[in-house]
Amino acid sequence: MPRGLLKKISLDRIFKLSKIDPWFLGQIKEIVDCEINLKKIGLPKNFTEFNRIKSIGFSDKKLSELTNLSEDVVRKKRIALKILPVYKKVDTCAAEFKSFTPYMYSTYQRNFSIVSECEAEPTSKKKIIILGGGPNRIGQGIEFDYCCCQASFSLKDAGFETIMVNCNPETVSTDYDTSDRLYFEPLKEEFVFNIIKKEQMNGNLIGIIAQFGGQTPIKLAKFLHQNKLPILGTQYSSIDLAEDRDRFRNLLNKLKLKQAESGIAKTYKEAIKIADKIGLPLMVRPSYVLGGRAMEIVYEKGQLRNFIEEAFKAAEKNPILIDKFIDHAMEVDVDAISDGKEVYVAGIMQHIEEAGIHSGDSACSLPPISIKPFLVKEIENQTKKLALALKVKGFMNIQFAIKKDEIYVIEVNPRASRTVPFVSKAKGLPLAKIASRVMAGEKLLKFNLKEKSKGMYAVKEAVFPFNKFPNSDLLLGPEMKSTGEVMGFDKNFGMAFAKSQIAAANSLPKNGLAFISLKNSHKDEGIGLAKDLIKLNFKLSATKGTAEYIRKHGMKCKIINKVSSGTPHIVDVLDSKKIALVINTGGGNSEHRINDAIALRRATLKNKVPYCTNMSTAQACLEAIKSLKTKKLD
């Protein structure tokens, strides 16, 4: 619509096309006219005009784009004219009587209220600002809001006034009683800066917590550092060191820790050069993004150009990262807390799926189910080394890959991770509360950390929105797709995994017809899988190649056609409700194989059939089925 107005399309014409009330169209036109004017004459020179522009809703960043000035210059000119936002309380009492709820929003509109202009009223207490996670989306979910809330409760108990900054009404952190004061504002530089300056007008601002809300507030760490605003916990220098590939590689070399060969590219030409040097397979991803957005595994050179271009788009002005992909490796997630001298390794989680599946989508087990004890000990040692070398204060998350008993560091995030609530529940420890107190200056030793649930297995399983999007593809990869998670808890791993599947609305069958389609490289391992299925009273069916291989090893197996081989095919059989379990690691790069695999995955989704896309998940499912058949579910 604004584009139409810029092209001089009349309001009457837009109304006829859109049916939007002309009053709203007039408001949009006012904004468009302001944009045109700003491009022509630049920033207003007087208070009245500048304040009018701000009251319409133009951010400093947008003004900088329209006037070809830096955002810093725009901010300084605005402050020089004493154009600052005022904060108003949300009227939680519907004007029936005076509202005292400290639930603030900013405005540049003035002289429209009989109450005092600014209602923020910063107190004289010692205070801590917590930056929330902003809007929920894939990769940035309620797990981070949990951390922010727990930090607020804990710091209040420790005698600090807590101030929450967030803009998502669907979160607990924006409840009126979670913090002492809430600013319902975007997690953007201008808005956060204004809030900090307002709170610094009275009392003692101890610091700003940026590491609990995920990647959104962490992106503000550089801005806070540049403006000499106090960051609580891990400092920007450490955050930047962990994100800067060249410097981080040097640190790993110094610590004698292994990492897959990698490079960082600022241009397309650099990316191609690095890719040629490292060789396939590769992991291509943008820096400073969450949820694995635009992250891809490149197996063929023909895929490279498109994936690099998409990574640069997602990275915006940041470089992209290119790593050698460690194929067929086991991935491990570690959460830890450090006070700068001591390090507590809170949880070592083994991913059920192989490396290459985003950590937010992979099921995982705490404690690990098949990692050798000496490797667990070495992971603990490497975690402690990295925490101390990075001068971490508060949370740290590390992702490792293990292949042939060698440990590789994938990445380090000096912030809270999405697994913190899971580890806290599994260990029976309020980790976010402890980390916030450590960031405020307390020592780890004070908390006498001892887990309360030894001898138990906790399994985290991702929950996906595929049932709401029937044409979506179930195949998982490095870009996150899940929108939630559940947890299974038991003394037995198989039962814990079974419980996690029940909680994720993916209940496993105890018998029936299993359908198997395997890559050639998985067929030897698949024979053991087939034998286990028969022992569990399943009958076998498979695609022609897999079925013939199973028959060679003395087992009965029904052949079912792929979709491209003609009817009746696997989708027909799934639609007839005759399949109880699908294990499909097959696929390929030819068009008909890709289409076959997509059709199979969509049919399993439509018919609510449990579906395994890799051997490790299939093995975990068999463990769970064994437990369901031999143990009582409680």
Task: Name the predicted role of every residue range.
Residues 69-84:
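Charge-enriched amphipathic alpha-helical scaffolds
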Residues 1-37, 41-57, 80-81, 85, ...:
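ATP-dependent carboxylate activation and anion-phosphoryl transfer catalytic cores
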Residues 243-246, 289-293:
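Conserved A3 ("GATE") glycine/threonine-rich loop of ANL adenylate-forming enzymes
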Residues 56, 62-66:
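Extended, domain-scale alpha-helical bundle/helix-rich regions
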Residues 76-79, 88-257, 266-273, 491-632:
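ATP-binding N-terminal substructure of ATP-dependent carboxylate-amine bond-forming enzymes
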